[in-house]
């Protein structure tokens, strides 16, 4: 068995689909729900031109969406790039450029920072905005919930055990 995170979590999802996988406050997801949501995000990543070894920045606070995004990246054999929530525009631009990120997941609370740097990052193919309690929103990102509501789950794939999974 391939011991990549995605392959392992898919196997767990098959074995105990109704058991709790993620708990964040009152938001509880089963392994089946975790797998389906990540598969839908993975479909969106692929549709936007990402593939094996693509780097994807995660500019999210601790949340279920963070882990779902990370799982989606692992599903396409990509590499998640963690982004410190304290980073300001110059640091964000530097990290996103130098990590070769092709997509970014971000919470709405950071939308002003994202709005300020987007035009200087033409290699980013997909911006995914995750709503939070900040009541901020931007017009630059695809809404996370729209992806969950409208995409079909990605078919499972065989993964390369030598893929870079963390930078």
What are these regions (language model features)?
Residues 9, 92, 144, 154-155:
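Acidic, amphipathic alpha-helical patches
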Residues 12-17:
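Flexible acidic/glycine-rich loop/turn elements at helix↔coil and beta-strand↔loop transitions
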Residues 129, 149-167:
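Conserved pre-ATP/AMP-binding loop-to-beta segment of ANL
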């Amino acid at each position: 068995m391939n011991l990549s995170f995605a392959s392992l979590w898919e196997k767990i999802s098959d074995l105990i689909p109704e058991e709790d996988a993620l708990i964040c406050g009152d938001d509880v997801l089963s392994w089946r729900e975790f797998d389906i949501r990540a598969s839908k995000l993975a479909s969106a990543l692929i549709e936007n031109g990402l593939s094996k070894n693509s780097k994807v920045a995660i500019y999210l606070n601790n949340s279920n969406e963070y882990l779902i995004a990370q799982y989606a990246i692992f599903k396409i054999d990509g590499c998640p790039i963690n982004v410190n929530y304290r980073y300001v525009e110059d640091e964000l631009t530097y990290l996103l450029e130098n990590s070769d990120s092709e997509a970014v997941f971000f919470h709405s609370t950071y939308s002003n920072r994202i709005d300020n740097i987007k035009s200087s990052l033409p290699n980013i193919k997909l911006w995914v905005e995750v709503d939070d309690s900040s009541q901020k929103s931007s017009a630059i990102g695809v809404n996370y919930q729209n992806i969950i509501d409208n995409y079909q789950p990605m078919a499972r794939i065989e993964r390369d055990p030598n893929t870079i999974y963390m930078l």
